[in-house]
Regions:
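N-terminal, charge-rich interaction modules
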Residues: 1-60, 64-67, 78, 178-180, ...
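Internal, well-folded beta-alpha domain core
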Residues: 71-183, 188-193
Length: 193
């Protein structure tokens, strides 16, 4: 097992990453570039940046089986103090891969009417942010509509289109591939083009 360096310039890179993540969340469907860095284990650069920027000892994290290896766990604990759990119903953040299933997705907390911000932010590391089913996004941060076509797991696409929780409840999604990030927060309406 070896520890991997985090950001090259920890303070500046974390601040820059935070601003880029905020841009992606406030402008759903806009692809943002995050700092290039080595991932941990099977993690790509963008997923590593998101975790290093947003995760700490107060944000329980669930990891999908294919990404959950010793290198990732030790690096997350060292760099972030992350509390890792196998219980999807007790997390603030989840890191998933395309094998994410519907039962796990629906087990993530979606907040409640008094505290919708307690919903899980789901980071899904994808093979590609293009070439999937074309989706039209509407809502806050989008002037009229925006099109995206990430190669989403079926359960995530179905969740986004059918939103099983009434507003303001729901999950926030961040899709990563390489050094790129696209976000679709729970306030965004999604339909197939």
């Amino acid at each position: 097992m070896s520890l991997v360096a985090s950001f090259q310039n920890p303070v500046a890179d974390a601040q820059y990453s935070f601003r880029r993540i905020l841009k992606a969340l406030s402008e759903p469907g806009v692809s943002v570039q995050l700092p290039a860095m080595p991932g941990f284990g099977a993690l790509d650069s963008a997923s590593a940046c998101v975790l290093l920027t947003l995760i700490d000892q107060d944000t329980p994290l669930w990891l999908s089986a294919s990404l959950n290896d010793e290198i990732l766990r030790k690096n997350l604990r060292f760099h972030t103090g992350a509390v890792l759990t196998d219980d999807p119903s007790a997390v603030s953040f989840a890191l998933a891969d395309p094998a994410l299933d519907s039962a796990t997705l629906l087990a993530f907390p979606c907040g409640d009417e008094m505290s919708p911000e307690l919903a899980t932010s789901v980071i899904v590391q994808l093979e590609n942010l293009t070439g999937g089913t074309p989706l039209r996004l509407r809502g806050p941060g989008i002037e009229s509509s925006r099109m995206i076509s990430p190669q989403l797991p079926d359960c995530v696409r179905d969740y986004l289109i059918n939103r099983p929780h009434r507003f303001p409840l729901g999950l926030d999604f961040m899709f990563t591939c390489g050094e790129e990030l696209i976000a679709v927060p729970r306030t965004t309406r999604v339909e197939v083009c």
